[in-house]
A protein has these predicted regions:
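Long, highly charged, low-complexity intrinsically disordered interaction regions
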Residues: 6, 10-111
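Short coil-to-beta-strand transition motifs
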Residues: 1-5
Length: 111
């Protein structure tokens, strides 16, 4: 449904950031690697967005690069891997390293 959101970076919490877009604050869950690359407070940023809707939860997940959101989508499509596990994996492993681990069958990295 959403491709991206562009807005003012307001701040962050443990596992999400807040982005202001036209006076509306969006809670966007993201990886540690994206959080580490966020601009200074009150600066404009563009995040690629994936909306996840479950019976008990609706959430936005955002990333600075298309590669990272595509990897997140791929990882959470695996049976038994949820959005929290996907964010955790992307927080400790770069997209490049994850691609290599998948192609080479490196189970240690993937576990």
């Amino acid at each position: 449904m959403f491709e991206y959101i562009k807005g003012i970076f307001v701040g962050f919490n443990k596992d999400y950031i807040v982005l202001d877009n036209n006076g509306m604050g969006y809670r966007i869950y993201t990886s540690g690697s994206t959080m580490a690359k966020m601009p200074k407070t009150n600066e404009t940023v563009l995040l690629y967005i994936k909306q996840i809707v479950r019976e008990d939860f609706i959430g936005l997940y955002g990333f600075l690069t298309k590669d990272e959101i595509e990897m997140f989508s791929l990882v959470i499509s695996i049976n038994g891997v949820g959005s929290k596990a996907g964010l955790s994996l992307l927080s400790i492993c770069s997209v490049t390293n994850l691609k290599y681990a998948i192609v080479s069958g490196d189970e240690k990295t993937l576990i």
